[in-house]
Structures are given as structure tokens and as C-alpha cells.
From Swiss-Prot:
First-level EC class: ligase
Keywords attached to this entry: Aminoacyl-tRNA synthetase, ATP-binding, Cytoplasm, Ligase, Nucleotide-binding, Protein biosynthesis
Reaction(s) catalysed by this chain's protein: tRNA(Pro) + L-proline + ATP = L-prolyl-tRNA(Pro) + AMP + diphosphate
Name of this chain's protein: Proline--tRNA ligase
Domain notes for this protein: Consists of three domains: the N-terminal catalytic domain, the anticodon-binding domain and the C-terminal extension.
GO biological process, one term: prolyl-tRNA aminoacylation
Regions annotated as coiled coil: none
HAMAP family, sorted: Pro_tRNA_synth_type3
Gene Ontology CC annotations of this record: aminoacyl-tRNA synthetase multienzyme complex; cytoplasm
Family annotation (PANTHER family): BIFUNCTIONAL GLUTAMATE_PROLINE--TRNA LIGASE (PTHR43382:SF2), PROLYL-TRNA SYNTHETASE (PTHR43382)
Amino acid sequence: MKNFSEWFHNILEEAELMDARYPIKGMSVWLPRGFQIRKYALNALQELLDKDHEEVLFPMLIPQSELAKEAIHVKGFEEEVYWVTKGGKRDLNEHLALRPTSETSIYPMFSLWVRSHMDLPIKVYQTVNTFRYETKHTRPLIRVREITTFNETHTAHATEEEAEKEVMEGIEIYKTFFDELGIPYSISKRPEWDKFPGSKYTMAFDMIMPDGKTLQIATVHNLGTTFAHTFDIQFENEDGTHDYVHQVCYGLSDRVIASLIAAHGDEKGLSLPPVVAPEQVIIIPIIFKENQDVVLNFTDNLEKLLKNNGIRVKQDKRELRPGKKYYEWEKRGVPLRIEVGPRDIENNTIVINRRDTGDKEFVDYDENTIVDVVKDRLDSITHDMKEASNKFQEEKTFAIEKPEQIKKTINKKGGIITCSWCGETDCGKDMEEKFDIDVLGTQESDLENKTCINCGKDASYKVLISKTY
């Protein structure tokens, strides 16, 4: 893909996903097709979360006094907060923030809900919009002023061990979710200077985009007891003593849809995994005047059969050339296309085309087996799209041992570089400036006899570095 940025902008419009012409910079309109993709993606995520969490909804406005309680947390984004200062024509006694993130709105309520160890754990999530006054160049779904799809989970636990277990649960939920969508990822522990403000540590998921930069697509934070102390979230133990809760939060945003588009799209346009496709199958009847009724009767029955068996299917009966229809539905990313013409009916066959590979096959038509055939092809598409995107992520991840290779590799190939690092903040920041990259985070690795690629000290971590969005 020669110009990913241009391609991405165009595909949002051409595939009818979003309209970025809303008269406020960094805010876009979800169009029906885009919103359906968003809905199906959220459905897949909520199905995973609902196994052990409950959905809630908190208000959008946060009192300035609550936001200010966690100074370290707020410092990370205080210049990006939108403020409500008037109610009608009256100045408000206290300014209200449009939710930049939800810790300071949720945790005051946790302090009211938690009294005893019997009230724990609390494990809730919500899907809301959040606001940040981005001053950098905005881009739909990637860098925005209104995040319209912020899914965030917040938990409170009696012990540090339970909180650590929740961190692992959050990571597993996201791994399963991204695997279902065929979105590749690398997981690392963010460096101290880039962790979530106020947290003990942050685990992050990053995807390599087609232009070689990485996009952060999800994070999981162990908050320790920092916010519990700030908002006085205490509980009484069985022995009558009191402790502060241990907390975890994790979240993802509109960027999931951006990564979905980027992971699977190509020069033809969008390519969607079946789980999120508004139409999993598009039926194109090949119509001539003399046999129109025969063909449409066949395709109507096929559409009804697939629909009755839980497959999202649509039939395109417009009076357009078949080639134009193929072009349009390929651009929209429909996973499977079925063509039926008079000759196919004579031969009792249908033609099945895969969007991901372009493979075309003639399939014998039997009402008793065709549903299984279609579901099998959709399953194959899901599997193969995941394999292809994971392969790209792997092939764009490079192990480097010499510092002079860093800039050369990043500038020529992009992607993620892994190398040995001492773990010291000064060294990490020096590396970012020297090589014009960002330190993504660290992974556990056997580093015996390894030295830091930047300063030459003994290495403590395998570090992931890249250019980022």
C-alpha cells in the first residue's frame, strides 16, 4: 500500500463508514455501515466481558473538585480537558469537565458502594464517549477529540493478588477479542514515563500499521491502591481491620475499528472478517430478461435459507452491470460473494468468491448442505485473515543487536524492533531522542550476557521500539 494515510481517509468515505465533515475538528459522524461494524465488534467484546463483569453507565460530567483530587493522574492530560462553565446564561459555581477518562467519576461512587469485604470484588464496565482537546493533527478513529467508542472496565479487589489476577484476565479478554477480529498485536509493559498516570504499571497492545508505524489499540492498568487512597475506598476485613482496595482498569477505543480496517484492507478497499461484517454474504443474481423470474426465484430462496440459519445476507437486485456490483461490494469488504446466473441454475451450481483471497469456486447446490458450505467458507475466511495479519506483524518485527541498525531498519522497513535494554529511564529517553523512535515497552526474556543496545550496561529487559501514531 503506497500511501496508507490517503488510502485510510478515502476508504472511510468510499466504504461508507464515516463522514469527517462535521464542523468541529476531530469529530466525525458514524454512517450506518460503519456503525454496524462498530456494533458487531462491541457485541463480540461484551460477550467476553459479560462472563465475569457487569455493565454500568456513569454520567459524562465530572466536577472539577473530583478531577483535581488525583493530581498525578490529571497532570497527564489537564491541557486537553473540555470544560463546561455555564448552565444557560449563568456561570456555574463549579466547573464541570467533559469526561476525559472515567476514574474520577467512577471511584467516588466506589467509595460509597464498598464497606465490607463482602462488597468485593466490584467488576464493572461501560461503553461511553470521552473528550480530549487534541492539538496535534487529528485523524478519524486514530487521533480524535471525541472518542465515541470508549469501552472501559474498572474493578476493585480485596488483595493485591486478586488485582494481579484481574490484570491477567483483562489481557486474556483482549487477546481473545483481537484474535476473533484477526487484529495482530504485540504486548509489552509500558516504561515508567509512559505508563497510565497514577498506576503501578501499564500493559499495552500495539499493532503494526501498513505504513510501518505502531498504533496502541488497548491498555490494561494495575492501579494498586493509589486511587483508593485518593477517593477513600476502604473495606472492613473479617477481623474488623480496614484496608484500601486494589484496583485495575483497562480499556480500548475507536482505534479498534481503525486497526480492523488497516489489518485487512487492500487496494480494492475494505475487507471484513465475518464476525463484524454487516453483510457476511452478498448474493448477485445474473439477470437476463428472458430468465429473470427463474433466477430471482432461485436467489430469493437462497437468501431466505441463509438468513433463516443465522447468516447475515443481502441480495443486490439493482439494474447495474454485475461487474459494477462486484466492485462496490468488494470495496465494502463483504467476506463472501455468491453469483447465480441461468447457466448456474441449469448446472445446479452457484459461484462462491472470497473477498480476502479472491478465490473463486463452483459449488454444487443442495438445499440440505449449502448452509454448511457457506458457514465453512466463512470460518475459513476468519482463520485465514487472522493468519495473514499475524504473519505481517511477525515479518515486521525485527531483532536488532547493533545500535547503528536501528535507524536504518526503522526508516527502511518500519515495524517493531526488539533489542536489549538496561531499563533506566534516562537511557530510554536518550534512545528515543537519538534514534527518533518511541519505546513501546518491555517483555520478559533471557538476557544473560546481554548488554544494553544504547548505553552498554548490563541488559535487564527485551525492549520494543518503533515509530508510533
